[in-house]
């Protein structure tokens, strides 16, 4: 039996697919659509993947350093968000950013189409512009699996058990 040599990129894509498959089929489809839209919008950005206890995250960065991520696709069993690590510094005239911490802000995404709204595009442009390291004008970013936690919250909403009386 022949085995096919896999490149690190193939392996990373396979691992990413495995992370996304933990979600319901509808949520997985939405995650893939948002990722494709962000990849089209930010082709030179590196994708840093974290499948942690609470959230599945793909950070978009001009380098391979997590601290240089300017935007993140964040998903859990309840929905998808676009987060900005330095979101408190972003101009938000439409008032769509949520969150009250010192730095992080996010928006909820109903679908990938939300990324094409002018106010969301403006936030992405501003986040890229305020990045510590400029995003390359050309080229294709790398997919890097940074962390997959062994213990995770369920990625699918489960029905609550009936209360005993």
Protein language model regions, located:
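Charge-dense, helix-prone N-terminal extensions
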Residues: 1-165
């Amino acid at each position: 039996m022949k085995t096919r040599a896999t490149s690190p990129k193939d392996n990373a894509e396979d691992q990413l697919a495995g992370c996304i498959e933990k979600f319901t089929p509808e949520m997985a489809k939405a995650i893939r659509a948002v990722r494709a839209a962000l990849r089209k919008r930010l082709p030179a950005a590196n994708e840093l993947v974290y499948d942690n206890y609470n959230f599945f995250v793909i950070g978009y960065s001009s380098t391979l350093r997590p601290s240089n991520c300017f935007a993140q696709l964040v998903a859990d069993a309840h929905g998808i968000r676009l987060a900005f690590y330095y979101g408190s510094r972003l101009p938000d005239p439409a008032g769509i950013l949520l969150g009250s911490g010192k730095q992080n802000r996010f928006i909820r995404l109903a679908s990938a189409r939300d990324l094409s709204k002018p106010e969301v595009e403006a936030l992405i442009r501003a986040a890229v512009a305020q990045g510590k390291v400029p995003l390359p004008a050309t080229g294709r970013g790398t997919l890097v699996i940074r962390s997959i936690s062994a213990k995770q919250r369920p990625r699918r909403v489960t029905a609550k058990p009936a209360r005993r009386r």
